[in-house]
């Protein structure tokens, strides 16, 4: 159990780093990227799925219209899923925008599928209404699609806090910095294991039917492309910036959704667990995703119980040390929770708390899936 926990959170990253270093030693470092010229760029749609986003329409459109991409090759599509605020009315002020409206709220996956049916360009990039992307993002994405092995491009998610000391945002940001490093190395080894919905793009000719009840539409859509034999290329040079969750309660909504969606995807993508089909993909997928979403949270509990029994039966000093370290870590987590509730800040204690918080939400995701597994609609986490 200890080895499973270590491998999931540290060991895979260490192993991946060693493999990448060896690969660079024999094949050299990746060449410096050169962005394609206007003539080389393919047509692309930026699709934004929205539910009641009237507060961010103006900011999002200002960001979108400032992107560096030829206007004759670029389309903007907003898919509004059951919005009952002023989102549609505000969008009508922009003649550049194609508005695809569904009066019924069926969830983001159904909205994406609705938008894809209206698509008229070679590629499509997806982004959220509340995220801002860098000026060269779409050119960078187009550059990576010039590789015929690439069927999906994942940008980088960056999390910002509106003011210093917002611990929920800082915890989320720390997690995504680690996650982005793993994605970069995964991509360099072969393929990233999934794309983040804040910014990713696909070749629509490779789209696989994603169930409407999918909670992780971005992950499912991108991994179906890997399943079909293409790669997900990851680039930090195309990034989406969003503010972190307003507080730990709001962040819990996101973690619960990710956990529930992760369990859904393990079942729907179970053929990818077969090492005889795609050996390298199976290794990356199990190591980076499956263990974290299913096995390891349970292993943490079993590890503590078994370790306690071994100490009780006086098996050896090593197990006493391991139990003390575990209890100390959980006490640090408890202290981090206590301080956070009172508005105090301690990064070390909060990091321990955030780790435990993530794993608790895996079990909450399991419970959610049992009671709400047939709906793809989800309550949005309020941002800071």
Q: What is the predicted function of each stretch?
A:
Residues 1-36:
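N-terminal membrane-anchoring/stem segments of glycan-assembly enzymes
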Residues 18, 22-26, 38, 242, ...:
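Membrane-embedded multi-pass helical conduit in multi-pass membrane proteins
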Residues 62-73:
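Short, acidic, metal-binding catalytic loop of nucleotide-sugar glycosyltransferases
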């Amino acid at each position: 159990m200890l080895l499973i926990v270590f491998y999931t959170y540290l060991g895979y990253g260490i192993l991946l780093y060693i493999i990448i270093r060896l690969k660079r030693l024999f094949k050299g470092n990746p060449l410096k990227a050169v962005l394609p010229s206007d003539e080389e760029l393919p047509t692309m749609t930026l699709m934004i799925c929205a539910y009641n986003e009237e507060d961010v329409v103006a900011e999002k459109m200002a960001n979108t219209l400032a992107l560096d991409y030829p206007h004759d090759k670029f389309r903007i599509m907003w898919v509004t899923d059951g919005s009952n605020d002023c989102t549609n009315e505000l969008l009508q002020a922009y003649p550049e925008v194609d508005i695809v409206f569904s009066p019924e709220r069926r969830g983001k996956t159904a909205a994406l599928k609705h938008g894809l049916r209206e698509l008229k360009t070679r590629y499509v990039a997806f982004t959220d209404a509340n995220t801002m992307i860098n000026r060269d993002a779409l050119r960078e994405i187009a550059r990576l699609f010039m590789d015929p092995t690439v069927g999906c491009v994942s940008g980088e998610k960056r999390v910002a806090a509106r003011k210093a000391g917002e611990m929920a945002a800082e915890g989320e940001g720390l997690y995504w910095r680690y996650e982005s490093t793993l994605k970069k190395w995964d991509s360099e080894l072969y393929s990233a294991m999934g794309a983040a919905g804040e910014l990713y793009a696909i070749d629509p000719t490779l789209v696989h039917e994603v169930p409407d009840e999918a909670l992780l539409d971005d992950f499912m859509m991108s991994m179906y492309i890997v399943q079909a034999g293409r790669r997900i290329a990851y680039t930090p040079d195309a990034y989406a910036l969003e503010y972190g969750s307003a507080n730990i309660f709001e962040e819990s909504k996101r973690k619960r959704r990710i956990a529930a969606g992760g369990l859904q995807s393990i079942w729907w993508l179970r053929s990818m667990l077969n090492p005889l089909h795609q050996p390298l993909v199976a290794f990356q997928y199990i190591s980076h995703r499956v263990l974290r979403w299913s096995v390891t949270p349970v292993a943490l509990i079993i590890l503590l119980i078994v370790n306690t029994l071994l100490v009780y039966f006086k098996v050896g000093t090593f197990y006493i040390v391991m139990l003390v370290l575990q209890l100390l870590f959980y006490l640090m987590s408890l202290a981090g929770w206590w301080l956070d509730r009172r508005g105090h800040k301690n990064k070390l204690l909060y990091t321990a708390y955030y780790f435990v918080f993530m794993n608790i939400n895996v079990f909450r995701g399991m419970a959610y899936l049992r009671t709400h597994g047939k709906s793809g609609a989800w309550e949005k986490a309020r941002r800071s």
